[in-house]
Regions:
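Beta-strand-rich extracellular passenger or scaffold domains
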Residues: 19-22, 26-161
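N-terminal secretory signal peptides that target proteins for export/translocation
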Residues: 1-15
């Protein structure tokens, strides 16, 4: 008696695996290039962060509507950070303020190629009162035709790349 069960869609031969790979590869190309993954965080509207938050994905501020994010002596770390970025033909003016000596906004700076970007589209990043914003690469003006601003004020405020 054979106790193993086999699903009717199970791939049983190497040739079937090849067909499955050829069939599924174009499906990946049909999805939008800029879709949110489950690990991504989206801050639309007004938000205030006073704690440490880490994301194993990207952070979007102002993705579906205007975003206004205040990091008040809190910390956000994510793979990439996008402020006021064009999505699905729409762009919303957004502001991120990082305020206080313990406040940080960090895009992960590691050896992986697709991590570490801080992108400003139609957005403003304000670093105030001793706060820190850091990324492997900071791009101000990612979207042609829209204004972006990066402002650091106050003693000890830092922007590093």
């Amino acid at each position: 008696m054979n106790n193993s069960t086999s699903h009717s869609l199970a791939v049983k031969t190497p040739l079937s695996r090849l067909y499955l790979a050829l069939f599924s590869a174009p499906l990946l190309l049909l999805s939008p290039a800029d879709f949110a993954r489950a690990a991504d965080a989206i801050f639309d509207g007004d938000s205030r962060i006073t704690e440490t938050l880490g994301y194993t994905g990207d952070v979007y501020v102002g993705r579906n509507q205007r975003g206004n994010l205040l990091i008040d002596n809190g910390k956000i770390t994510a793979y990439n950070i996008n402020i006021g970025r064009l999505f699905d033909g729409q762009i919303y003016e957004s502001v991120v303020t990082v305020r206080g000596p313990n406040a940080e906004l960090n895009a992960v700076n590691d050896q992986y190629v697709l991590r570490g970007d801080l992108n400003l589209g139609l957005g403003t990043l304000r670093v105030e009162e001793g706060a820190l914003a850091s990324a492997k690469e900071i791009v101000v003006g990612t979207t042609r035709g829209y204004d972006s601003h990066l402002i650091a004020t106050g003693a000890g405020s830092r922007v590093t790349s």
